[in-house]
Amino acid sequence: MLLDRYTPKTILYEVTPSFDYLHEEKSYHKYLYKLKRHYDRNGIDSIFWDVDRTERYKMLSGTYQHNSSFLQNLIVYFLGLSTDTGIKGYRPLYGEMDTMKIKRGKLAYDSSKGYRYDSFKMRYLFNFLQKAKKQNLIFVVSPMWYEMDTLVLEPIREICKENDIPLIDFSNNPKYVHNNKFFKDGTHLNAIGADEFTHDLIVELRKQRAFQ
């Protein structure tokens, strides 16, 4: 689906370890939520079947397909209104983070074996890689308020090394780490931080001649 209708000259892929390749105790079903209403589009149905074979039969029911998004669909499709008016992929967050409200999630780490990787997620990551690497693929790790354990990025570093893919890592950049003015919470930049990071990222991309 990635290259079916449009072939980008460059693909910047935001690496999020917990989403892209770390093991989770929670079900994969949570990732299917926003795809339900697009189920009939080419290639979407096979993702559902891959997560859970019974989805093939559950999705035969229109009630099941839309039971969690009925109100949104009513607003968008029948009333002609959009719940995302004016948003084109970027929603600015205003205000600085409150360090008193920080709750850091636990990553899938085993003290004897290290981080636990998810073979299911890794398969999808490699599938994406094979399709996208010919389109000037660049992996990017955005700044975080927390200091990130560098070991958690080892799989991506290995993938980039083996496939000759650039990796731009801002996760532990001292300009951003623990700098409250750039963050809305521990993992999301606020509007000021997003503007600053955009500038810094463009500088790095130009250094690597990413757009030539």
Region spans (language model):
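Conserved SGNH/GDSL esterase-like catalytic core that processes O-acyl groups on lipids
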Residues: 1-34
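Loop/turn elements at helix/coil->beta-strand transitions in domains of secreted/extracellular proteins
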Residues: 7-10, 133-138, 165
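Active-site-proximal beta-strand/loop segments in catalytic clefts of secreted hydrolases
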Residues: 14-16, 141-144, 170-173, 190
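Secreted/periplasmic serine-hydrolase-like ester/acetyl group-modifying domain
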Residues: 15, 28-135
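Extracytoplasmic/secreted cell-surface and envelope-processing proteins
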Residues: 19-28, 148-150, 177-180
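Extracytoplasmic/secreted proteins, especially bacterial periplasmic and envelope-associated proteins
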Residues: 34, 43, 59, 124-127, ...
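Acidic-and-aromatic substrate-binding clefts and catalytic sites of carbohydrate-active enzymes
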Residues: 115-119, 145-152
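C-terminal regions of proteins
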Residues: 153-212
